[in-house]
Amino acid sequence: MKLNRLVALVVALCLMLGCTAIAEQFPLVDEPTTLHIMAQVGSYYPDQKLDNVHGLQKYEEMSGVHIEWDNVSNSVFGDTLAARIADSGTKLPDIILRGKIGNDKLASWGEQGIIVDLRPYLEENAPNFWKLFNEEPTISGAIVGANGEIWGLPQVILGAEMRTPTKLWLNRNAMEAIGMDDPKTLDDYVKVMTAIRDSDWNGNGENDEITTIASANNMHNYFYGSFGLRTRGAHHDVVDVDPETGELRVYFQHENFRKYVEFMTMMYQEKLIYQEIFTEGDKQSDVFNQTNRLSMLLNTIAPGNGGDNWYTVNWSLEGPDGYAFHTQTRGAIHSTGNFVITCDCPEELIPVALKWVDYFYSEEGSALALIGVEGEDWEVKEDGTRSWTDTALATRTEDMSNDAFRAQFGMWPGGGVPACFFSNLLDAEYGPIPSACAQALLKDYAPKKIWPIITFTADESAVVSQLGSDINNFAKNFAAQVMTGEKELTDDTWAAFQDELAKMNPEKLIDAYESALTRVYGEGAEF
């Protein structure tokens, strides 16, 4: 009994101290203050407006800072922002939020005086971010410019759940119906998918089962690892390190890319992959799940209201040469350029703007920004885990996607959030099974080195952004043509593909990476 009283006293004291700390921190201003924010939003947000997000409404009350939101759809955000910057007669917003703006563009805008260097203001006005910046070395490599500038703040991810986004999700009913073990190799996977394709596991008497569904990018990024490709993680396509030689390479030039294309062609032509993957991707996954047709999914989380019917596995699929990399593994940075202050922000409001966003880099502020208001949208259960409240769950309709549901409460869906994603942010999303999966993938299947987002010089960036994109698009288009039967993969077509690739001068891309990686890791270091 005495112990229980002591625990209760400690908890009460902690809560009181926490409330005191928050009371001292807020409001952020002594008089009414307004910030104008241009934000990128997706269709899953209520009326496509961040104004309607409950966590942000609550934060306006707490901070005393009123936000005039300019919500711009993600389909036109880039063009809209570029047009406003190009029009010298248009006043820019104080802040550009969730833009996922690349370092090369940030550096260019910074040199032109369009955006503000945040570095001089951070230590005093953004202590939460400054602490992360000094504790996690990959952050500085990702956001610090050539002369020490910091033009924008990133989305930081510390939890394994967010660092290993693409996982293989299996439908429990489908697996029980075919009576087979979970696949551990590509050969196993083919056998399981074939059995599912022919099973009528949903029992409706129709051959309407969807085997594996994914976006085209998730498909590539997941299966590359089974062929020893893309061995330096999620932030860098096209260039990696050969796991056998340790040399930099453009991995589309390796023979294993041919093996990959051959395997995926067989999967597609045998209808073991969703046939509209190149046109619809995974957009219909929730619909197929609701109609009891979906068997497997490559995604961060289970589809729709998957519940206990979906589970994931703690390994990557082993390929023909023994590779089983989980190449869709991130460093501590999800994306850069998610909080940018423009030249039109009044100088006296720059500290206020940074204090406003800095709360999102604390554990309490992160939860508010991403999943909403504690006690109203989510709660801490007796076992210490976090879960949606009954009130929040009551808003969910059968046809509502995970993103649309979460977007009512916080800015999580769509990414590009200037915040820190801590581990087990919400156990309703990342319960024991997917959390264990993420930990296992990060520990046992991630490449031995994950390249962070890199700040390239202007010359390097010109090569990486243009040539890298051209090569990536060329290779993926070749794979799609072969998979769909538009082109047959023979020795001659493979040789022609390699000849065209060589004409694109991939050595320039490798040289740019070698120069940048030497700055990151040091002269003579292993990349």
Predicted regions and their residues:
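Extracytoplasmic/secretory soluble proteins
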Residues: K2-L3, V11, L15, C19-F527
